[in-house]
Amino acid sequence: MDLTITTLEGKDAGKVKLNEEIFGLDPRDDILQRVVRWQLARRQQGSHKAQGRGDVSRTGAKMYKQKGTGRARHHSARAPQFRGGGQAHGPVVRSHDHDLPKKVRALGLRHALSAKAKASDLIIIDDLAATEAKTKQLVSQFAKLGLENALVIGGAEIDVNFQRAASNIPNIDVLPVQGINVYDILRRGKLVLSKAAVEALEERFK
């Protein structure tokens, strides 16, 4: 698959041949869903907690005698059916993380990249560098490229001026290539890769 390389100014800078095993797969929604679900589960805090009958601050003594009152048999007022009692089967502090094989995670990333390429939402930029950290200038350049909602992936290190200029632009995320992930790719409209990012990804999936 051949794709045109552009500069930040919108000029052509040649072509690049993309690896079909990374950018030319037929995307599978089930694989993408599994990876996104795994990512969000790892991110979920899990600090929710409700007091059970063993946690509430009430006496554990029997409410009244077993027989002779004509009332229902009860033990402690901590039981869930009473006002001020503990919650039955309430949430507890836990991790929502679950396992996902490394091969499935790698496959998910390749399918996400292929999905963007197939939808013509993949743009290759020659170099992600800015002469000065000016947001206004970068917004103008992005407008020429039609980037209003995009994930921008640079090389192993992002140019400091470019990072600062892009940090104030809404709906634009900038990550180094080692931070690329399925969730961030899918949540943004366009995917922008630098030439260095393409080379790093192809090296990673060799």
Curated annotation (Swiss-Prot):
Record has Signal as a keyword: no
Family matches, as InterPro entries: Ribosomal_uL4 (IPR002136), Ribosomal_uL4-like (IPR013005), Ribosomal_uL4_dom_sf (IPR023574)
Family matches, as Pfam families: Ribosomal_L4
SS bond list: none
Keywords: Ribonucleoprotein, Ribosomal protein, RNA-binding, rRNA-binding
Gene3D superfamilies: 3.40.1370.10
Basic residues bias locations: 66-77
One Gene Ontology molecular-function label: structural constituent of ribosome
GO CC list: ribonucleoprotein complex; ribosome
PANTHER family from the UniProt entry: 50S RIBOSOMAL PROTEIN L4, LARGE RIBOSOMAL SUBUNIT PROTEIN UL4M
Name by which UniProt lists this protein: Large ribosomal subunit protein uL4
Organism: Brucella anthropi (strain ATCC 49188 / DSM 6882 / CCUG 24695 / JCM 21032 / LMG 3331 / NBRC 15819 / NCTC 12168 / Alc 37) (Ochrobactrum anthropi)
